[in-house]
Regions:
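Glycosyltransferase donor-sugar binding loop
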Residues: 82-86, 245-260
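Alpha-helical solenoid repeat scaffolds of the TPR/TPR-like class and their adjacent stem/linker regions
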Residues: 1-214, 232, 264-271, 282-293, ...
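Substrate-binding clefts and catalytic carboxylate motifs of secreted carbohydrate-active enzymes
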Residues: 218-229
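Short hydrophobic "strand-cap" motifs at the C-terminus of beta-strands
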Residues: 51, 220-222, 249, 279
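Short acidic/histidine- and often glycine-rich active-site loop of Leloir-type glycosyltransferases
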Residues: 326-337
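Residues at the starts of beta-strands that form the adenosine-phosphate
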Residues: 77, 243-245
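Short hydrophobic beta-strand element within catalytic cores of glycosyltransferases
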Residues: 315-324
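Short alpha-helix at the nucleotide-sugar/activated-sugar donor binding site of glycosyltransferases
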Residues: 309-311, 334
Length: 381
């Protein structure tokens, strides 16, 4: 999990660690791969099972719910294998989208794999990858004839037992197949995920720079994504925009010690702390109301917060990097039809942010129209 955030390691080196994971935790279970007896009758409904610890109030809801709520139940019989410590109101909604709700907390991987096989699942979907609460040990036993990983993690699982990694051309371009244990299944003419905003985000406000007289840049990302490379690039931008401020706001920066460590790194590049606003405020969309231009991180891009950034009327600039966690920002912008905000180098990233900041009238127009554009785009279809 953490290796994906390494600012220097090349993609091939990181993938080798996934191959080691397969040797230790995947290959020992290949003896449990046995032929499946699923009916080949094309007239019957397909049994599709989703395995997740996040059928609750969680950022994954913004992407899982649009899919689960739109299944054609005349063609698909939906199973949810829910590994939850507690349920909430969102859980209740999920239960309404599926025919079969199976709590799996406390069930061993072997027992759950046996249950999935007994249920006759045709397609089994992993929604967690290597995140907390995953059941990759179940997938290693290949309890369904077809399995795939999607969305919750953002990269390969390393398991050869999983057949496909559901993605798109922008996230996993042609030629990147050697970086996945699964076969990349690229959605055509649509992004890898669509977004349904959460409640309470409110309306888009006018561009803050019009009132303040200076540009505010910002990110809502976790601290693990903010490394020495991003700080240098953001410092270079602040040098090019001498009146601009930057907001770095997430739960990672609640601790004053962490805040000061980030300030020290910017000051080492000659940026005065009076231009830095580092901390944690909630809800995040209220923070976005005070920002003019969003900044994506690299080499591991942000995720949900990029959708929120656009939805609140802010353009953002991203650096396209290694598949696929380094191309999340690019995939989202491709879905929006705003490829001009994708940089291919750190210098181009700086230039694109400076270019956006140089035209406040255009930024104000973007602020007023971007949500409507997003709602009519593939990102929310």
């Amino acid at each position: 999990f953490v290796l994906n955030y390494h600012p220097e390691n090349p993609a091939e080196e990181i993938f080798r660690s996934y191959q080691e994971y397969e040797k230790k935790f995947g290959e020992p279970h290949q003896k449990e791969w046995v032929a499946h007896s699923n009916s080949l009758d094309e007239s019957r409904r397909l049994k599709v099972g989703y395995v997740s610890p996040d059928f609750r109030s969680h950022s994954c809801t913004y992407f899982m719910e649009p899919l689960l709520s739109h299944h054609d139940h005349g063609k698909v019989d939906v199973y949810a294998y829910a590994d939850l410590t507690q349920e909430d109101a969102v859980t209740a909604r999920y239960k309404g989208y599926v025919e079969h709700w199976i709590p799996t907390r406390g069930m061993s991987d072997a027992a759950l794999a046996q249950r999935i096989r007994a249920d006759g699942i045709d397609i089994l979907v992993d929604l967690a990858g290597h995140t907390s609460g995953n059941r990759l040990g179940v997938f290693a036993r290949k309890p369904a004839p077809v399995s795939l990983s999607w969305m919750g993690y953002g990269y390969t699982t390393g398991l050869r037992a999983i057949d496909y990694y559901l993605t798109d051309e922008a996230s996993a371009p042609q030629g990147s197949e050697h970086l996945f244990s699964e076969e990349p299944w690229r959605l055509k003419d649509t992004p890898y995920a669509v977004y349904r905003p959460g409640p309470g985000m409110g309306e888009v406000n006018p561009l803050p720079a019009l009132e303040r007289g200076y540009i505010t840049l910002g990110t809502l990302t976790r601290g693990v994504r903010v490394n020495h490379r991003t700080i240098k690039v953001w410092s270079d931008i602040l040098k090019r925009l001498p009146t601009a401020h930057i907001v770095i706001d997430s739960a990672s920066f609640k601790d004053p010690t962490v805040q000061q460590a980030a300030i020290d790194k910017f000051e080492a590049h000659g940026i005065d702390k009076s231009r830095l606003h580092i901390g944690y405020n909630s809800p995040p969309w209220d923070v976005l109301r005070g920002i003019d231009i969003g900044l994506d991180c690299f080499p591991h891009n942000s995720g949900t917060t990029l959708f929120e950034t656009l939805y609140m009327g802010l353009p953002y600039v991203t650096l396209a990097g290694r598949p696929s966690v380094g191309r999340i920002g690019s995939a989202i912008l491709h879905g929006l039809g705003r490829e001009q905000w994708i940089a291919s180098s750190e210098q181009e990233y700086v230039d694109k942010v400076v270019e956006l900041a140089s035209d406040t009238a255009a930024l104000a127009q973007l602020r007023a129209s971007l949500r409507q554009q997003m709602q009519g785009s593939k990102l929310m279809d």
